[in-house]
Amino acid sequence: MSKKAVVLYSGGLDSTTCLAEARAAGFTPYALSFHYGQRHTVELEKARLYAPQVGAADHMVIDFDLRRIGGSALTSDEEVPKGREIDDAIPVTYVPARNTIFLSFALGWAEVLGSFDIFIGVNALDYSGYPDCRPEFISAFEQLANLATKAGVEGQGQYRVHAPLLHLTKAQIIKRGLELGVDYSLTHSCYDPTPEGLACGLCDSCQLRLKGFAEAGISDPAAYAREVQR
């Protein structure tokens, strides 16, 4: 019988590949998504549709509202940058403590499930400078998980936070996902989609996605609101 793993699953390119990686590693994935007041809820709609198709044993969607905290263009009326040159500075699309919050929910569910494995699709190469996508953060949270839980303190097992995409480029992630059978037409990456759910093609996330597909030599199957170089 395969081991259970909680997989943070947004419906985006990286998290969908990460879920496929969990399955390939022999885990039974329990997908965990969040409706946190983000403007790009079409991503969550993709997650709801795709989770059963990729073999998730269960798919939990947790609702809470980070708009009450604000501090991000993804949870406020602040404009999402378009067409900028991506650098190492932390952008306005950073959501304060988001991955810490997400991983905390994942840890709680994992403890209830009797699982000691959590998967997250963070990437430290082709990303927008987010502090909670770095190896140091993953290592620190893993240590916290083993200090902050009944199961960890009682020595029932050792929690591990798996980040299989951490050191891959976006092109490598896409190629790996295709090897694992991921259908990227069922994923969404855009931070600021149209009301019809079309990707803008200009935000950081769209730029990184398009760049990844171009470098992989593969046409991006996503639907865009404007002509893009695929």
UniProtKB/Swiss-Prot annotation:
<comment type="function">
    <text>Catalyzes the ATP-dependent conversion of 7-carboxy-7-deazaguanine (CDG) to 7-cyano-7-deazaguanine (preQ(0)).</text>
</comment>
<keyword id="KW-0067">ATP-binding</keyword>
<dbReference type="GO" id="GO:0008616">
    <property type="term" value="P:queuosine biosynthetic process"/>
</dbReference>
<dbReference type="InterPro" id="IPR014729">
    <property type="entry name" value="Rossmann-like_a/b/a_fold"/>
</dbReference>
<feature type="binding site">
    <location>
        <position position="203"/>
    </location>
    <ligand>
        <name>Zn(2+)</name>
    </ligand>
</feature>
<feature type="binding site">
    <location>
        <position position="200"/>
    </location>
    <ligand>
        <name>Zn(2+)</name>
    </ligand>
</feature>
<dbReference type="GO" id="GO:0005524">
    <property type="term" value="F:ATP binding"/>
</dbReference>
<keyword id="KW-0436">Ligase</keyword>
<feature type="binding site">
    <location>
        <position position="190"/>
    </location>
    <ligand>
        <name>Zn(2+)</name>
    </ligand>
</feature>
<feature type="binding site">
    <location>
        <position position="206"/>
    </location>
    <ligand>
        <name>Zn(2+)</name>
    </ligand>
</feature>
<feature type="binding site">
    <location>
        <begin position="9"/>
        <end position="19"/>
    </location>
    <ligand>
        <name>ATP</name>
    </ligand>
</feature>
<dbReference type="Pfam" id="PF06508">
    <property type="entry name" value="QueC"/>
</dbReference>
<dbReference type="GO" id="GO:0008270">
    <property type="term" value="F:zinc ion binding"/>
</dbReference>
<comment type="similarity">
    <text>Belongs to the QueC family.</text>
</comment>
<comment type="pathway">
    <text>Purine metabolism; 7-cyano-7-deazaguanine biosynthesis.</text>
</comment>
<keyword id="KW-0547">Nucleotide-binding</keyword>
<keyword id="KW-0671">Queuosine biosynthesis</keyword>
<keyword id="KW-0479">Metal-binding</keyword>
<dbReference type="InterPro" id="IPR018317">
    <property type="entry name" value="QueC"/>
</dbReference>
<dbReference type="GO" id="GO:0016879">
    <property type="term" value="F:ligase activity, forming carbon-nitrogen bonds"/>
</dbReference>
<protein>
    <recommendedName>
        <fullName>7-cyano-7-deazaguanine synthase</fullName>
        <ecNumber>6.3.4.20</ecNumber>
    </recommendedName>
</protein>
<keyword id="KW-0862">Zinc</keyword>
